């Protein structure tokens, strides 16, 4: 059982805050820096880190991730000034990313080739209704099976409609 962390990069408005941290001011402490959850995650040995919606992330996030994901480097600089702390990625940390790649997806960006080269690409088909029911039942064990079946049915109909020539979704 490995520690896991989830980061929705598509919803990140400020990549630096999400991936590095923030500077704060307190009248008693003065100015201080607080590291992000991402910094904690990469310092956690054997962690599994999910970078969701990588293709929706701001390019600044990609730039920050380049050295973190490069197997030959595996570090994060908190600041580019001399003498600033460099965070090494802990042993056994695994990164997994999701991305919707292609022109048919809205609000996505074409991923930088250097960034893509840091991953093994696995293309996945959509789940069929039975697989989707099974996954939803696993993820939401307290939800009634009839509700789960309805959600999977509606999702399937929505996907078919979205891909039709006369989409009304």
Model-based region annotation:
Residues 1-149, 158-159:
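AAA+ P-loop NTPase catalytic core and its hallmark functional loops
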């Amino acid at each position: 059982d490995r520690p896991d962390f989830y980061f929705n990069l598509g919803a990140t408005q400020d990549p630096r805050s999400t991936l590095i941290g923030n500077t704060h001011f307190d009248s008693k402490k003065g100015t201080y820096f607080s590291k992000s959850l991402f910094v904690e995650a990469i310092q956690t040995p054997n962690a599994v880190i999910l970078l969701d919606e990588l293709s929706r992330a701001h390019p600044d996030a990609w730039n920050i991730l380049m050295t973190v994901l490069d197997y030959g480097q595996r570090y994060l600089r908190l600041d580019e000034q001399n003498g600033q702390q460099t965070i090494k990625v802990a042993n056994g940390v695994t990164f997994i990313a999701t991305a919707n790649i292609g022109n048919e997806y809205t609000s996505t960006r074409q991923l930088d080739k250097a960034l893509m080269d840091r991953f093994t690409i696995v293309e996945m088909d959509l789940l069929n209704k039975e697989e989707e029911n099974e996954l939803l039942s696993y993820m939401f064990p307290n939800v009634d099976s009839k509700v789960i079946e309805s959600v999977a049915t509606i999702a399937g109909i929505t996907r078919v409609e979205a891909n039709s020539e006369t989409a009304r979704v």
